[in-house]
C-alpha cells in the first residue's frame, strides 16, 4: 500500500503541463485570422472615389449608378449597402466628394476641386526629388578639380629655387666690389712720401749762400 502512493503523485504533476500548452496555440490562430482579413481588397471609400472619378457626368454620379459601378467591379452591394452610405457621408465630410443633389447618402456625388488639385500636385512633388541627384553628380567633378589645384602648389617650390640661385650670384659678385674699394687706398699711400721729398730740397738752398759770404771776407785783407 505504501508503494502505490508515490506513483499517483507524478501523474498529478504531469496533468497541468498540457493545460499550459493549449493557451499558447490560441494566439497563433488569432494571428492567422488577422492575416486572412488583410487581403480583402481596397476599402469602400477607395472604391467609391474611383467610381466617381471614372464617371464623366457633369452633374455627378447618382447612388444607383454608383452601386452599378461597384457591382461591376465585383463588390457585393447588397451585403455592404450600409457601408456604402457611411463611406459616402465620410467622403463628403472630409471634402473629397461634393453632393450635387439630394441629402445624406441619397443623391448624386462628384469629386471636389481640392481633391483633383491634390492628385495633380502629387506627381509634381516627385520632380523635386530628382533635382538633388544633379548636385550629387557635380560633387565628383568638383573633387576631380581639386587635384589640379594641388599641381599648382607643386610649381611654387620651383619659383623658390630661382631666388636662391640669384642670392648665390649676388654673393659671388660682392667680393669684386671689395677689391675695387681697396685699390684707391694704395694710391693715397704712394702720394704722401712724394710730397715730403719735394719739401726737403727747398730747405737746403739757403745753405749754399753761406760760403759766398766767406769768400768776400777773405778778399778784404788783400787790399791792405
Curated annotation (Swiss-Prot):
Keywords: Chromosome, DNA-binding, Nucleus
Domain H15 positions: 40-113
InterPro entries xrefs: H1/H5 (IPR005819), Histone_H1/H5_H15 (IPR005818), WH-like_DNA-bd_sf (IPR036388), WH_DNA-bd_sf (IPR036390)
Span list, region Disordered: 1-43, 99-224
GO BP terms: chromosome condensation; negative regulation of DNA recombination; nucleosome assembly
Compositional bias (Basic residues): 122-137, 145-162, 170-188, 197-224
MF terms in GO: double-stranded DNA binding; nucleosomal DNA binding; structural constituent of chromatin
CDD domains linked: H15 (cd00073)
Gene Ontology cellular-component terms listed: nucleosome; nucleus
Major localization listed first in the record, in broad terms: nucleus
Keyword DNA-binding: yes
Localization terms from the record: Nucleus; Chromosome
Comp. bias intervals (Low complexity): 1-22, 30-42
Family: Belongs to the histone H1/H5 family.
Function: Histones H1 are necessary for the condensation of nucleosome chains into higher-order structures.
Protein name: Histone H1.03
